[in-house]
């Protein structure tokens, strides 16, 4: 009987070892100022993810369709030069210090006003013109994945405090886990997210208008003409923003709705009912052509659904594909835009002695 137990235990350990994702690293060229860039490949039976130290970004995710054929389901470029030249899409990157927008690039902490350089319609977007997406991070292999680390000095893009950030990408079965942590030497504001553009048809084919989206949120945060929240939390009931039932993205995207006109499509924040209460469902996506599905869970209080409205056919990505309007969609799990200037929104203040923690999981599957 003891021998049987030993065999069972050995089998369990062997299966566990076999299930572990493989991780490899290689050089991926240099930036224009000569900084070496690396790329990591994390592979499991169902998922292969490539992540580069330039912007701590996801370069590719290979996932199977309903026939078992794998294809790349995120937009991006074949090399560092492509990402470095493109300063507007943020393909696959970690954006920060403050993902999304800060009105007029200005906020105050304890009576001191701080200014972030403006880079989007008179506002600061994704941490300013030299945010985290433009930095070369330090990468290291960890169990089932890679950890990206960055030290942002006091005053970087106008933000106070030296901020130390760690982002862990791990692959477990069909899921890509992203775990964020950060500490600061001075009170500061922080909002980290990943800016991957998903196209579940694979290899950048077609648009996402036929994709069926579900967001289990009763409310969203409307924006003004420069895409800054008005401060209101509005009901989705009776609007094109009601995705509580699975709905094709293209079904209402051209409706005569003032909010849709502002961003020429969807580019708003949805309010999650489970924010701050552990992992909760943020969204699901289904591509009827490939059968691929994407399920997003997060600990964050919001998710920005962006339908790729500003892709305009001027960028050629992987596989020689020209990225036209609606070529990909983003589901950016986050705190709300302009939270530092909206006391009613969940706080993004981080103080010395505190550690920011958040997690988002992207799980891929198929529907036959």
Residues of each region from the PLM?
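Bacterial N-terminal signal peptides that target proteins for export
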Residues: 1-8
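Hydrophobic h-region of N-terminal signal peptides that target proteins for export
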Residues: 12-20
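Intrinsically disordered, low-complexity segments enriched in polar/charged small residues
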Residues: 9-10, 200
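An exposed, glycine/acidic-rich loop-and-rim segment of catalytic or binding clefts
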Residues: 21-368
